[in-house]
Amino acid sequence: MVSSWPPRKCGIATFAEEAAEFIKKKDEQRPFYVVSHTDGEGDNVFPIIDMSRRDWYEPVAKKIQELDPYAVHIQHEYGLYNYVDENGDSDQNQGFLELLKRLGGLATIVEPHTVHGRLREHEENFVHEMTSLATVVLFKCHYQKWRLGWNFASRGWELPANIMIVPHGARPDKKYAIDEVAALEDELGLSYLKGKHVIGLVGWIQSNKRWDILTSIWEELHDRIKARTGEEWVLLAAGEMRDPNHTKDYVRYVNGIEHLAEKDIAYFHKFIPRGDPYYKVMAVCDLIVLPSLDETQSGTLARIIALNKPFVTTAPLEGLTAQTLESGGGLLFTNRDMLKKQILRLATDESMRWGLGYKLYRYLMEVVSWEVVAGQYYTAYHAAIEEKESGTPVYFEPEF
């Protein structure tokens, strides 16, 4: 696998680590290697992607060819392979394309994490060339494939036939029973939540994750929920910043939480949202709010699904909306008033919360469990290898 890798505070690194765990379980006899950026660590990890070099792809291609792999599974995000020269000019991921050219004799499977429904020109150009160089390309959502066909048609390009849909995986082994929550609260230092219902804002704190949308209306919502149910609900905002460019918004979001904390209706819990703690913090929540303004799919949503937590998220927003509709396990909002209504619906209707949670359980076990997704990865690997051996290009049916 080629990817960013822990301990980097990066959503792709976390994704790749989880994916690798289940890929290895699927075929425990086959060795698994990672070629990562220079900050990657771990067994069988080669940290040689040096983005300070224009030709970073040369040593990477050489190492991969030395390993002589069964297949090369590459995680792609534009920022991971963005070379910037001394004048501040980006190569627009041309180095990534050069890597694919040098791996042309191998079965390459590229998994891009950002494929917008409406592409910018440089994204169209990149995706067009990337799909022509990779053996198989894995999109997360069906809409990304049929929208790409529409986008490419305006340029006179055909929809690539090598695009397979494989959803963002979610762990099938992180569900917690209600009677385990009190112990989790003690373990996490969240004992002040005992006896209260909890709405969670959990994950990496970023500019696009608009926590302030909820904090600005929470006091009113808190009072309305209590008037209707007599129950005490609190807001738990939990996470940490990973990109210093988001410091201004981070401070603003946290200040909003601390203002509510003075009234004892909200709390801020600082932690690194990675590994077991990420799941455990979410597990103490009755429902999750995910107010994001720019995302094609979401690792946060994958964890919400893993825990079967009913949720409310922004729409229309690419993969968030698609998975909410496909799973049936969440509610959507387009403005503040709608957000208020959706939270009120969930907070005042326990049977609805249970119903949405069950739908998420079914969606998890049947569609997005890492055990299911790992099997789809191997289908992609076999298809890519078959193309290299037979010379017959892979073909996946268009969506419509």
Segments from the language model and where they lie:
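Aromatic "clamp/platform" in nucleotide-sugar-dependent glycosyltransferases that forms part
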Residues: 293-294
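Donor nucleotide-sugar binding/catalytic pocket of nucleotide-sugar-dependent glycosyltransferases
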Residues: 132-182
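Conserved donor-binding/catalytic core segment of Leloir-type glycosyltransferases
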Residues: 191-209, 215-218, 236
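A short helix/loop element that forms part of the nucleotide-sugar donor recognition site in Leloir-type
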Residues: 175-192, 253
